[in-house]
């Protein structure tokens, strides 16, 4: 039976409907499928009965059908609102789906996006990430790194968080405004509507990213608030979407290492700046970041560099899209 991607999105909101079921259904999705409630019920009913057998959901058919109708109607309303806000969606079976994201079996089953989705495949992508509280030296180094990447036409990928993420996006946006080179992609752990973007202080930056030829990307429908688990997944996708990963600065724990773990799993090269402050007399915060850099190098095989020129030399042998 041909299935519409809208049906899969609606089914994903039903408690107890598993990823493996949805993953199988994605392959059967077709743009030619008619979007209607009858087709949705025919598609999801077999899984509904399995849920009851597992003790998930009610054995009352009337209650079960009300749940399906609610999920279907609510999803279609949200998708209509998405279109009004120029937020689009695709399934992982689409030819437009970013090819790098398919590198792991746990890739998002569908994506919501605002902006230019093509840059994920037509440009080299560099994940520039790090702590929410970078030092002045780290921010200075990061701006130089991002200017370099933008100059050579990289798409700078980050997560719109405060600190290193925000600096990566802002530097890319400013460079694009001044030169027309480079761009940036923000992967979010929430819906792409203005009311859901986290942190809300960066909602305006999100609009600037789109206006400058960039992209906002999420696996969550509008109206979805950020949650800790979503942030962990977001960290992984940043690396998975990229050709290289650059953790500007980090402590010994945090989301940066989720990204580095995924990079190591996929043999994605990673590079970390060795900052001058790491040679300074000990200070608790600097010592923590020094240890974070050491962990990235020793455990995750990050290659350290002191200048952009060194990074350039490291990238010359390969790392093409």
Q: Each PLM stretch: what is its role?
A:
Residues 1-5, 92-321:
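Glycine-biased, small-residue-rich flexible motifs in mid-sequence functional cores and linkers
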Residues 1-140, 318-319:
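Short, positively charged patches
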């Amino acid at each position: 039976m041909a299935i519409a991607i809208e049906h899969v999105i609606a089914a994903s909101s039903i408690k107890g409907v598993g990823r493996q079921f949805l993953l199988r259904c994605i392959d059967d999705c077709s743009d030619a499928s008619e979007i209607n409630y009858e087709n949705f019920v025919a598609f999801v009913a077999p899984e509904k009965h399995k849920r009851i057998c597992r003790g998930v959901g009610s054995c009352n058919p009337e209650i079960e059908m009300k749940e399906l109708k609610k999920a279907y109607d609510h999803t279609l309303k949200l998708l209509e609102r998405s279109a009004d806000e120029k937020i689009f969606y695709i399934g992982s079976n689409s030819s437009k789906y970013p090819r790098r994201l398919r590198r792991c079996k746990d890739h998002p089953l569908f994506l919501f996006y605002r902006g230019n989705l093509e840059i994920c495949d037509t440009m080299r992508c560099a994940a520039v990430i790090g702590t929410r509280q970078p030092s002045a030296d780290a921010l200075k180094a990061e701006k130089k790194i991002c200017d370099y990447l933008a100059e050579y036409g990289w798409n700078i990928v980050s997560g719109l968080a405060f600190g290193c993420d925000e600096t990566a996006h802002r530097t890319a946006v400013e460079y694009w405004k001044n030169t027309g080179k480079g761009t940036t992609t923000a992967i979010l752990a929430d819906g792409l509507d203005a009311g859901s973007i986290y942190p809300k202080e960066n909602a305006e930056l999100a609009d600037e990213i789109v206006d400058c030829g960039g992209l906002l990307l999420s696996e969550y429908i509008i109206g979805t608030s950020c949650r800790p688990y979503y942030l962990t997944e977001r960290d992984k996708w940043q690396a998975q979407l990229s050709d290289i990963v650059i953790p500007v600065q980090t402590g010994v724990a945090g989301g940066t290492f989720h990204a580095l773990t995924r990079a190591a799993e996929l043999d994605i090269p990673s590079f970390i700046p060795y900052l001058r402050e790491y040679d300074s007399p000990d200070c608790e915060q600097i010592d923590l970041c020094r240890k974070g850099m050491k962990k990235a190098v020793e455990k995750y095989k990050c290659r350290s560099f002191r200048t952009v020129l060194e990074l350039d030399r490291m990238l010359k042998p390969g790392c093409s899209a």
